[in-house]
Structure formats: structure tokens, C-alpha cells
Regions:
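Phosphate-binding P-loop
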Residues: 1-5
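Hydrophobic anchor at the beta1->P-loop junction of P-loop NTPases
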Residues: 10
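The conserved Walker
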Residues: 14
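ATP-dependent NMP and nucleoside kinases share a basic, alpha-helical "lid"
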Residues: 48, 52-54, 71-127, 134
Length: 178
């Protein structure tokens, strides 16, 4: 499938469903023969590209800017990039979106209590116990997008519905064909 380069940036709290939606999107796009496709997962990026950064606001912003830099390079070379990263601060997300241009912001929205119930990594429990400082949603803010391109309410809709919303928007914007 031929398509224009675009970055699809999934943002939301830990446990909201970003990685789950990203993996399902990747699978669906590959089944449609989308060959120029890359995934930048925040957890994997932190182990490689941004290793050594902490969780201060400055370090988080640096992390997002670096992910954005790589996504921009890929996007301008015709690659569809799926980014899955908490990216808690609105200002730096908007900055990265402006730099990339072909940017689809997907707000993966689930209430904090739902994310805590899902807590597959045990991070919320550790944050509540004081073992993790500056944890997004607990003692560090998450600033939701003011006008996301797509909002997926993962507490109210199925995975297929969320993926369908994103694919539908990519089709509507001309990034993929149906």
C-alpha cells in the first residue's frame, strides 16, 4: 500500500492502552501491505535512544523531543510512524506535532482508576507506596490534549473500535486507502 509519511502519536497515561492499540494498528496496517511502517515505543526508546534520562520535566521533554526528531526523519521520508509514549506535557507534544507536520495525535483516554486496575507493570502500586517519584498521574501531571485528532476511550470501547477510529481518521486524511 502506498501512503504519505505520517506520525501517529498515541499519548495517555500508563495502562491506558497505547501499546495495545499500537500493536493492533501495526498488525492491521501490515496486513494491508503497508511496508514503510515503523513503531517507536516509549519504553523501548528509553532503553536505547534516551538511556540515561531521568523523569524530571526537562528529561521527559528531552525524551519526547528525541522521539519526535526520529519520527520526523522517518515521516519526511515517506514512512508511517506509530509512536506510543506517555508524553505527559501538552506543550512539547504540540511542538513536536508542529515540527513533524503530518501528525495525527491520538489521545488514548482511560480514567486513572482504570489505569491503576490494569497496572500490568505494577508501577502505580509502587508509586502509591512512594517507591517511584514523579510518576505521571500520581505525583506528576498528565496534560490531556486540548484538541486531539482522535480520542480512544479504552474504558468504554473495544480494541477493535479504537483501532477502527484511528484507521478511519487515517483514511479520511488520505494517509491510507481503505
Amino acid at each position: 500500500m502506498e501512503h504519505r509519511g505520517v506520525t501517529v502519536w498515541l499519548t495517555g497515561l500508563s495502562g491506558a492502552g497505547k501499546t495495545t492499540i499500537t500493536k493492533a494498528l501495526e498488525q492491521e496496517l501490515r496486513s494491508r501491505n503497508c511496508e514503510k511502517l515503523e513503531v517507536l515505543d516509549g519504553d523501548i526508546v528509553r532503553q536505547n535512544l534516551t538511556k540515561g534520562l531521568g523523569f524530571s520535566k526537562e528529561d521527559r521533554d528531552t525524551n519526547i523531543r528525541r522521539i519526535g526528531f526520529v519520527a520526523n526523519l522517518l515521516t519526511r521520508n515517506g514512512v508511517m510512524v506509530l509512536v506510543s509514549a506517555i508524553s505527559p506535557y501538552r506543550e512539547v507534544r504540540e511542538e513536536v506535532g508542529r515540527q513533524i507536520g503530518n501528525f495525527v495525535e491520538v489521545f488514548v483516554n482511560a480514567p486513572l482508576n482504570v489505569c491503576e486496575e490494569r497496572d500490568v507493570k505494577g508501577l502505580y502500586k509502587r508509586a502509591r507506596a512512594g517507591e517511584i517519584e514523579k510518576f505521571t498521574g500520581i505525583d506528576d501531571p498528565y496534560e490531556p490534549p486540548t484538541n486531539p485528532t482522535v480520542e480512544c476511550r479504552t474504558d468504554l470501547e473495544s480494541l477493535d473500535e479504537s483501532v477502527g477510529k484511528v484507521l478511519g481518521k487515517l483514511e479520511e486524511l488520505g494517509y491510507i486507502s481503505n
